[in-house]
Design a protein with these regions (language model features):
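Short linear regulatory motifs enriched in tryptophan with gly/pro/ser
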Residues: 1-160
Length: 160
């Protein structure tokens, strides 16, 4: 078993620590999160692999919604152990894309326990999703859309 901490990104502390079998897939972890946080099981969700700064990487969705089947690795095809295996491994879990609940999921430790369970429960899920600010840092400002287009194309670059 491994111990995993799930933390809601919010002003209030909402934390669950659970023991799970690392050989189960991410869909199983998704269901465990739903159960332990008492969330609606009918909402869409995705895990995102992150780096040490929690920058978003590859999305691992619940379902493949791409035009070609098999183009996307889904939760069902990804073992927990392949993404949560050391103290440095973290995921971001986005639940309910309309309200954008965001959770940090991190590996805590390996455990000799043999039963999956919740080992720590702190706080309750608020009724409304926290307001998250997604800030983008711009290196330089673009004066206008026309300037941006003018800079992007060179008439002499193409043959007619």
């Amino acid at each position: 078993m491994i111990k995993i901490r799930i933390t809601l990104e919010s002003k209030e502390d909402v934390i669950r620590e659970i023991l799970v079998n690392p050989e189960n897939n991410l869909e199983y972890l998704h269901q465990s999160i739903i159960k332990n946080l008492k969330l609606d099981e009918f909402e869409m969700a995705s895990f995102y692999i992150t780096d040490s700064n929690l920058d978003l990487g590859e999305e691992i969705p619940l379902f493949d919604t791409s035009e070609k089947d098999g183009d996307v690795i889904t939760m069902k095809n990804m073992p927990i152990s392949s993404v949560l295996y050391s103290k440095d491994s973290k995921l971001i879990y986005i639940y309910d894309f309309m309200n954008m609940w965001r959770f940090f999921v991190e590996y805590l430790e390996s455990s000799e326990e043999i039963t999956e369970k919740c080992t720590r429960k702190l706080g309750e899920i608020p009724e409304k999703a926290p307001d998250l600010k997604f800030e983008v840092e711009c290196q330089e400002e673009v004066e206008s859309y026309e300037d941006m287009l003018e800079d992007s194309f060179d008439d002499n670059e193409y043959e007619y």
